[in-house]
Swiss-Prot record:
It comes from the Bacteria. Residues 123-217 form the Rhodanese domain. Residues 282-312 are annotated as: Disordered. This is tRNA uridine(34) hydroxylase. The active site is at 177 (cysteine persulfide intermediate). The lineage of its organism: Bacteria, Pseudomonadati, Pseudomonadota, Gammaproteobacteria, Pseudomonadales. Keywords: Oxidoreductase, tRNA processing.
Length: 312
């Protein structure tokens, strides 16, 4: 099968007409057979999509025809099967939800650090290195020496910073995330909170894995991604993890040997905390998935748990 191109993209840019952009953007995706979810807000665009080489190229040609998006960048990886079930364009208040009024990367942002320069920065003992992703993402891979805030959503990040760090004592802060969007917005928040030197990894972990040879890498483990691959290895090939549809946690090969693992319904992370209502919903969803597989069709029901991660 011809490789499917998976493109992760975002750009903070003022889009006053973002509501009007939704329909032509959605039509461009549909016309070119591109699947996935894109988020539009006044502060910019964010998402991960997949399709043929021609389809992805057509999408970016359309995006870059808008002068505001002419320099939009993206990261690419490849897989043999379509990793998304649907095509969506959603309107949001924020393209990545921090929930703090006034934080605007279009006005204030930290210093971008290229992948080739990242190792030198985070090896500096005076630099505080923070992983801005969710706890279940950090659990399967992170940079050597990084702090895990143990947050379940990006909304919890500001309170974590307030509770643990002081701008007067922590002079240099470096942050990273999967594709660059969280840490870029986090850098805007940190500067507003009084931190003086704030750095973030340009292009995120995915760009680092793409550009830095594994033998020189300070990355440890797999990287969680927002599609049906669940994780990628250092060479950006698909990892060994699955994802629990009930709790969204990545599920390792070892986890899948557990008596508490029931495909699509529960895993060792959530088996003792699910309500019967949640279990019943998961059972019905899994039933529909199996029926769709038997018919060789995409799964038609329920939202993909990976899609919601874009917003958290």
């Amino acid at each position: 099968m011809t490789s499917i191109v998976v493109a992760a993209l975002y750009k903070f840019v003022t889009l006053d007409d973002y509501v009007a952009l939704r329909e032509p953007l959605l039509q461009t995706l549909l016309d070119n057979g591109v699947k996935g979810t894109l988020l539009l807000a006044e502060e910019g665009i964010n998402g991960t999509v997949s399709g043929s080489r021609e389809g992805i190229d057509a999408l970016f040609a359309w995006l870059r025809s808008d002068p505001r998006l002419a320099d939009i960048e993206h990261k690419e990886s490849y897989c043999d099967e379509q990793p998304f079930y649907r095509t969506k364009v959603k309107l949001k208040k924020e393209i990545v939800t921090l929930g703090v009024p006034g934080v605007d990367p279009n006005k204030q942002v930290g210093q971008y650090v290229e992948a080739k320069d990242w190792n030198a920065l985070i090896s500096d003992p005076e630099v505080l290195l923070i992983d801005t992703r969710n706890d279940y993402e950090v659990a399967i891979g992170t940079f050597e020496g990084a702090v895990d805030p143990k947050t379940r959503s990006f909304r919890e990040f500001p309170e974590y910073i307030k509770a643990h760090y002081d701008p007067a004592r922590h002079k240099k802060v470096a942050m990273f995330c999967t594709g660059g969007i969280r840490c870029e917005k986090a850098s805007s928040y940190m500067l507003g909170a009084g931190f003086e030197e704030v750095f973030h990894l340009k292009g995120g972990i995915l760009k680092y894995l793409e550009e830095v040879p594994q033998e020189q890498s300070l990355w440890r483990g797999d990287c969680f991604v927002f599609d049906n691959r669940v994780t990628v290895r250092h060479d950006l090939s698909e990892g060994e993890y699955d994802q629990c549809h009930a709790c969204r946690n990545p599920v390792s090969l070892e986890d899948r040997q557990s008596e508490h693992y029931v495909p699509g319904i529960s895993c060792p992370h959530c088996w003792d905390s699910l309500s019967e209502k949640t279990r019943a919903g998961a059972r019905e969803r899994q039933k529909q998935i199996e029926l769709a597989r038997q018919r060789n069709q995409p799964h038609p029901l329920g939202r993909d748990p990976r899609q919601s991660t874009l917003e958290n």
